[in-house]
């Protein structure tokens, strides 16, 4: 009887060990697949906002980490991607966060050329209200395309606000908080780049850990 109990316990232990190993293997495989999909989506986004003819490097491979909660809207460091042509930096795409969206944080990426002009903006993640605040998503509206070609004349540039606040950017019908937060995030990012352009564009890549 005792021998049977020990045998059954051993079998159960072995079964549990095998199940744990299988779950770990599946989780690792799933994580890698998700990571690959995220990287592919990021590369597609980068090529949308920084034209291929502007650079000859692999954008995702020249990644730097930037940490400034006041500008980026989040305590943790966020990646930025340097575009270069013939070894010379020509543009940057900076991830940033609008912490004051209607339904929480809005994560976006802002591409800026060496002259300080916006090349493009895209929304990476948000929880804004469908049919109202989700117009920040290019799949829902062309609103984000309005940032292309824009620049900033100092941090007090009053054009960088929604029209309801005296600025030049459209708000959404029934949803002002979302575009107001979004415009503010792009403005802060652009002002930060203008103030730190040489340091940012000439910083060596340091995102290796992120892409292991």
Curated annotation (Swiss-Prot):
Keywords: Cell inner membrane, Cell membrane, Electron transport, Flavoprotein, FMN, Membrane, Phosphoprotein, Translocase, Transmembrane, Transmembrane helix, Transport. It is a single-pass membrane protein. Its cofactor is FMN. InterPro entries: FMN-bd, Ion_transpt_RnfG/RsxG. It is an enzyme of class 7 (translocase). The modification FMN phosphoryl threonine is found at residue 176. It comes from the Bacteria. The chain crosses the membrane at residues 9-29. One of its GO terms (biological process) is electron transport chain. GO terms for cellular component: plasma membrane. Pfam families: FMN_bind. It is found in: Cell inner membrane. The keyword Translocase applies. GO terms for molecular function: electron transfer activity; FMN binding. Its EC number is 7.-.-.-. Belongs to the RnfG family. NCBIfam families: PRK01908.1, rnfG. The complex is composed of six subunits: RnfA, RnfB, RnfC, RnfD, RnfE and RnfG. Part of a membrane-bound complex that couples electron transfer with translocation of ions across the membrane. This is Ion-translocating oxidoreductase complex subunit G. The lineage of its organism: Bacteria, Pseudomonadati, Pseudomonadota, Gammaproteobacteria, Alteromonadales. The gene is rnfG.
């Amino acid at each position: 009887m005792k021998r049977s109990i020990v045998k059954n316990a051993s079998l159960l232990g072995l079964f549990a060990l095998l199940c744990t190993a299988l779950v770990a293997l599946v989780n690792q495989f799933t994580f890698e697949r998700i990571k690959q999909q995220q990287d592919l989506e990021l590369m597609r986004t980068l090529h949308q906002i920084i034209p291929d003819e502007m650079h000859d490097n692999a954008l995702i491979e020249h990644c730097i980490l930037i940490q400034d909660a006041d500008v980026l809207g989040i305590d943790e460091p966020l990646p930025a991607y340097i575009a270069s042509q013939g070894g010379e930096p020509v543009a940057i795409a900076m991830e940033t966060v609008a912490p004051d969206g209607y339904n929480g944080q809005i994560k976006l990426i802002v591409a800026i050329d060496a002259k300080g002009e916006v090349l493009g903006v895209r929304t990476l993640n948000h929880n804004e209200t469908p049919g109202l605040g989700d117009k920040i998503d290019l799949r829902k509206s062309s609103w984000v395309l309005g940032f292309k070609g824009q620049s900033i004349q100092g941090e007090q540039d009053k054009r960088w606000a929604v029209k309801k606040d005296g600025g030049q950017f459209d708000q959404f019908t029934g949803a002002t908080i979302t575009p107001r937060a979004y415009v503010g995030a792009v403005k802060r990012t652009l002002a930060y780049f203008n103030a730190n352009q040489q340091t940012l564009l000439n910083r060596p890549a340091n995102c290796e850990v992120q892409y292991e």
